[in-house]
Amino acid sequence: MSKRKTKEPKVDVVTLGPSVREGEQVFGVVHIFASFNDTFIHVTDLSGRETLVRITGGMKVKADRDESSPYAAMLAAQDVAQRCKELGITAMHVKLRATGGNKTKTPGPGAQSALRALARSGMKIGRIEDVTPIPTDSTRRKGGRRGRRL
């Protein structure tokens, strides 16, 4: 009988450019997408091409109704901050996004708590930018001619 070949688990090694001097900040970009159904916290390198960490509120809580809650966003942000510290990222630029388009331009309930949790976990915050898509001339909004009747 021949020996069975087993695959060893593949370990990704992420390097963030050249070596960093003492006291120098290594920046990442954290994209926070806060809708009213979930909160996504997605960390990339400065170019935005390489995903380093991506955690959602739904990965942290069991009940579907709690996915967008501030508590779930806080847990997700703490996980993201811990993983970033392992990778050597010490500072972040924040890009905050709501649903936008012809839907609501207001960020969901998890946006503020995610940002606070990142700041409290020891991450330096560089710039905070709102990147909610704003329509210049949009498709027709949902609700019909007479709008949504309450």
Swiss-Prot record:
Which InterPro entries does the UniProt entry name for this protein?
Ribosomal_uS11, Ribosomal_uS11_CS, Ribosomal_uS11_sf
Its chief place of residence is cytoplasm
Q: Which residues carry this modification: Phosphoserine?
A: 19
Localization per record: Cytoplasm
Superkingdom of the source?
Eukaryota
Q: Which family does the entry's similarity section mention?
A: Belongs to the universal ribosomal protein uS11 family.
User: PANTHER family of this UniProt entry?
Assistant: 40S RIBOSOMAL PROTEIN S14/30S RIBOSOMAL PROTEIN S11 (PTHR11759)
Q: Subunit structure, briefly?
A: Interacts with AAK6.
Q: What's the protein here called?
A: Small ribosomal subunit protein uS11z
Organism in which the protein naturally occurs: Arabidopsis thaliana
